């Protein structure tokens, strides 16, 4: 007999506005506890220094978190010029100070260098692993290990303002882009050094900025529900985004109850207009209930890749 999961079977995505000073895992565990969720996972860590958009997947939505991890991101970053640190942010030790002396044209030429497709060497102060251990652990021990440059793409790099020694930029980039590394490299190109003093993630995939909620807002709703002796889900669940928003960029294939039954049992089915070599979003019937994602197999049939478990909601 299957063991009953601890917590509530709740599915959806919380678009959390993470505060500074907390780890992404700490934020994840807080949200999981507030929702009393049986399962939860985030979609790519934000540095403790950083604030902003951190999608938290609950329940069956965790099956599609990789799609958000792979999605484009957008950041607002403020760099302090003239000072370089060992971590490329304000948490690190100052390693060099230099005068600031560049023209507006030199700044624009430096920014242009980072636009488009480039190769980036990850910072030693990152969570990437080398021989099973995060790079930042080697860095804290004063060790430097080899890192391979990785391809990244900066879709947009917009100048926002320059006030004194503080430069603010808006960056729309591909997954795996280290904003601290861009900031450090930019500082070196300008000949003065730089480090991040403010970093805010303003976008993940196509999620709307105004749908974010803070931990304080969630905890206030939980407290209100308890005070009014109401089920917390009445106040908390309306804030959840549907789990299929994680794969909203995929082509939709709508199937009948009969075909859905075959798919849910792991069997491929024949459908029309199935794209080649692309994942698709599978919906059911006129209500277009999301049932998962699939892909064309070698026989030209729609094969299930990752399906949701449809269950009755628990209190």
From Swiss-Prot:
Keyword Isomerase: yes
UniProt keywords, alphabetically: Isomerase, tRNA processing
Signal sequence bounds: none
A GO biological process held by the record: mRNA pseudouridine synthesis
Active site (UniProt): 47
Catalytic activity: uridine(55) in tRNA = pseudouridine(55) in tRNA
EC number: 5.4.99.25
Classification via InterPro entries: PsdUridine_synth_cat_dom_sf (IPR020103), PsdUridine_synth_N (IPR002501), PUA-like_sf (IPR015947), PUA_sf (IPR036974), tRNA_psdUridine_synth_TruB (IPR014780), tRNA_sdUridine_synth_fam1_C (IPR015240), TruB_C (IPR032819)
Molecular-function GO terms, alphabetical: RNA binding; tRNA pseudouridine(55) synthase activity
Keyword match Cytoplasm: no
Record HAMAP family: TruB_bact
Function: Responsible for synthesis of pseudouridine from uracil-55 in the psi GC loop of transfer RNAs.
Listed NCBIfam families: TruB
Family: Belongs to the pseudouridine synthase TruB family. Type 1 subfamily.
Official protein name in the record: tRNA pseudouridine synthase B
Species name: Shewanella loihica (strain ATCC BAA-1088 / PV-4)
Gene this protein is translated from: truB
């Amino acid at each position: 007999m299957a063991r009953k999961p601890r917590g509530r079977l709740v599915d959806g995505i919380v678009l959390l506005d993470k505060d500074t000073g907390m780890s992404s895992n700490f934020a994840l565990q807080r949200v999981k506890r507030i929702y009393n969720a049986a399962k939860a996972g985030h979609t790519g860590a934000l540095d403790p220094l950083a604030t902003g958009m951190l999608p938290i997947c609950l329940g069956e939505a965790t099956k599609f978190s990789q799609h958000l991890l792979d999605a484009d991101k957008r950041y607002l970053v403020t760099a302090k010029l003239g000072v370089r640190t060992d971590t490329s942010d304000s948490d690190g030790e100052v390693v060099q100070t230099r005068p600031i002396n560049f023209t507006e044209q030199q700044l624009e030429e430096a920014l242009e260098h980072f636009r488009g497709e480039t190769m980036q060497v990850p910072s030693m102060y990152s969570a990437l692993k080398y021989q099973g251990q995060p790079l930042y652990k080697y860095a804290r021990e004063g060790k430097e290990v080899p890192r391979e440059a990785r391809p990244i793409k900066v879709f947009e790099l917009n100048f926002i303002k320059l006030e004194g020694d503080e430069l603010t930029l808006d960056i729309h980039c591909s997954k795996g882009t280290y904003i601290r590394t861009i900031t450090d490299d930019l500082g070196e190109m300008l000949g003065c050094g730089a480090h991040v003093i403010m970093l805010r993630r303003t976008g993940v995939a196509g999620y709307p900025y105004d749908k974010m909620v803070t931990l304080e807002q969630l905890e206030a709703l939980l407290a209100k529900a308890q005070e009014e002796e109401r089920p917390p889900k009445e106040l908390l669940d309306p804030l959840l985004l549907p789990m299929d928003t994680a794969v909203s960029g995929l082509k939709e294939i709508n199937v009948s109850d009969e075909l859905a039954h075959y798919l849910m049992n792991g069997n491929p089915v024949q459908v029309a207009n199935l794209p080649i070599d692309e994942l698709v979003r599978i919906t059911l019937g006129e209500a277009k209930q999301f049932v998962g994602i699939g892909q064309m197999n070698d026989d030209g049939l729609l094969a299930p890749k990752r399906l949701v478990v449809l269950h009755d909601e628990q209190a």
